[in-house]
Regions:
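Conserved ABC ATPase "signature" region
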Residues: 99, 114-132, 157
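The feature captures the beta-strand-to-loop junction immediately N-terminal to the Walker
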Residues: 35-37
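Catalytic Walker B motif of ABC-type/P-loop ATPase nucleotide-binding domains
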Residues: 161-165
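Helix-to-loop junction immediately C-terminal to a conserved catalytic motif
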Residues: 50
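Conserved structural motif at the start of ABC-family nucleotide-binding domains
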Residues: 4, 19-21
Length: 186
């Protein structure tokens, strides 16, 4: 079972606690939503769970293992994420950005197989981003970038998908479509 859970997690910045004693558990097929006002620490919790921020206290488990005991390569095969921060993607097409989600499955040289490219194309189709896949990622709209970042996480093909404001920058039609796809993926 690929459950993700936290026990007595304390998150914050520069050794200053923001939120303490966070106890979450999400099992396969479940969707958990963190709700709160801007600046309340939702993104900080997600960044800490995904090891983008150092935890101040407590434990994050991926399955039965503490994430402290797992290598980054092990984590990236089991957990994917879409965060609100911008990737540095100089001179990359949308399709190349999505393809980077397959890197945990490639060898040392990062060469994708036909099967990898099929997963990339399937994820792009799922988020309806085919029209921008060949364009420079930095020259498309925020909403188009958001859809491609979701495709990147989907084609990473993990059991756990962590999304920080996944419908940011999207118009209403795409918001509904993305939320439907997220439900289907669960």
């Amino acid at each position: 079972m690929q459950e993700i859970r936290t026990e007595h997690l304390t998150v914050g910045y520069d050794k200053t606690p923001l939120i303490g004693d966070v106890n979450l558990s999400v099992r396969p097929g479940e969707i958990l939503t963190l709700i709160g006002p801007n600046g309340s620490g939702k993104s900080t919790i997600l960044k800490t769970i995904t090891k983008q921020l150092k935890k101040l206290d407590g434990t994050v488990f991926l399955g039965e293992a503490s994430m402290d005991e797992l290598k980054d390569s092990q984590i990236s095969r089991r957990l994917s994420m879409v965060m609100t921060e911008r990737l540095r993607t100089e001179l990359m097409s949308g399709r190349e950005v999505v393809a980077s989600g397959r890197y945990p499955y490639t060898g040392r040289f990062g060469i994708l197989s036909k099967e990898d490219w099929a997963k990339v194309d399937e994820a792009i189709a799922l988020v309806h981003a085919g029209e921008v896949q060949d364009q420079d990622f930095m020259k498309i709209s925020d909403g188009q970038r958001q859809r491609l970042m979701l495709a990147r996480a989907i084609c990473q093909d993990t059991k756990i998908l962590i999304l920080d404001e996944p419908t940011s920058y999207l118009d209403m039609g795409f918001k509904m479509d993305i939320l439907t796809n997220i439900r289907m993926l669960a």
